[in-house]
């Protein structure tokens, strides 16, 4: 179990680093990880929505679809929080929406 947790942590950290460099696919992958609980990661729809939102603003149609799908299972407050986190991440990393 500890090995898979280390693997999941490494995967997430490496995809976040890629996302910070502007990799749209990394954002999409993070959305998938958090929306499905891949690699033993806890499902977190706010975090998933944040990453799908970032991938979507950089042009990923698949992320737009996934974001819409998970939004059906979220409250308006949760969606607003995910959007706030996405904006904060853009500011923090100096990235801009496409």
Task: Please state what every model-predicted region is.
Residues 71-98:
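Alpha-helical linker/edge segments of TPR/alpha-solenoid repeat scaffolds
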Residues 20-24, 37-38, 52, 58-60, ...:
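Short helix-capping/linker turns of helical repeat alpha-solenoids
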Residues 43, 47-66:
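Amphipathic, hydrophobic secondary-structure cores in small proteins
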Residues 4-14, 41-50, 77-81:
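Structural signature of tandem alpha-helical TPR/SEL1-like repeats
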Residues 29-37, 66-71:
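Hydrophobic face of amphipathic alpha-helices that form TPR/SEL1-like repeat modules
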